[in-house]
A protein has these predicted regions:
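Terminal low-complexity/charged segments
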Residues: 1-185
Length: 185
């Protein structure tokens, strides 16, 4: 595909029933889909000779706690041959299980584990879905907007016990409310 406009037309014509919306901005093609179409759309953009998006750059989530579908899943793909990028996205409910891309892109393994660890999003058929960035006994998911800024526990090395211990967070100072409104306006 020579241009993003050509790519957009190709994808819209080939995947008519699987694409909710497309938009070109910032030299990238943004595609909104339903979660059930993720595997089909991903296989198409990876294997089709006119697209060749053979590198998965990243998988992440965005937390919108006020929305009925709390999380927006975002997938970034790169076509080295055409020097183009696609960003796939869809929204899901809080406890929804979504398809894993590890069978299509092995690199999705750690990316999906990171999303699971940070947001609590589960991936169906993932080969090793466990925490990757936080401790094994860690409670909660730190990138959710309802997670406390200080966390629940403090992990530190105890000189007395000669080991790493975990204890509830003790703040030296209470939270302060800052009023940023100007009295002169």
């Amino acid at each position: 595909m020579n241009t993003l406009e050509d790519l957009e037309k190709k994808i819209n014509s080939e995947l008519t029933t699987k694409i909710n919306n497309t938009e070109i901005k910032h030299d990238q093609l943004y595609i909104k889909i339903d979660k059930d179409d993720l595997v089909d759309v991903t296989l198409f953009i990876k294997t089709n000779q006119d697209t060749k998006f053979r590198q998965l750059i990243d998988i992440t989530a965005v937390d919108y706690p006020e929305n009925s579908q709390r999380f927006k899943m975002v997938y970034l793909f790169l076509s080295h041959e055409y020097n183009q990028r696609i960003i796939l996205s869809y929204s899901i409910n809080e406890n929804e299980v979504i398809p894993s891309l590890t069978n299509i892109f092995p690199a999705a393994n750690w990316m999906e584990r990171e999303v699971f660890d940070m947001y609590g999003v589960s991936f169906k058929d993932h080969p090793d879905l466990r925490r990757i960035l936080t401790d094994y006994g860690f409670e909660g998911h730190p990138l959710r907007k309802d997670f406390p800024l200080t966390g629940h526990t403090e992990v530190r090395y105890s000189e007395e016990q000669k080991k790493v211990i975990s204890e509830p967070v003790k703040l030296e100072q209470n939270y302060r409310n800052f009023d940023y409104e100007s009295p002169w306006e």
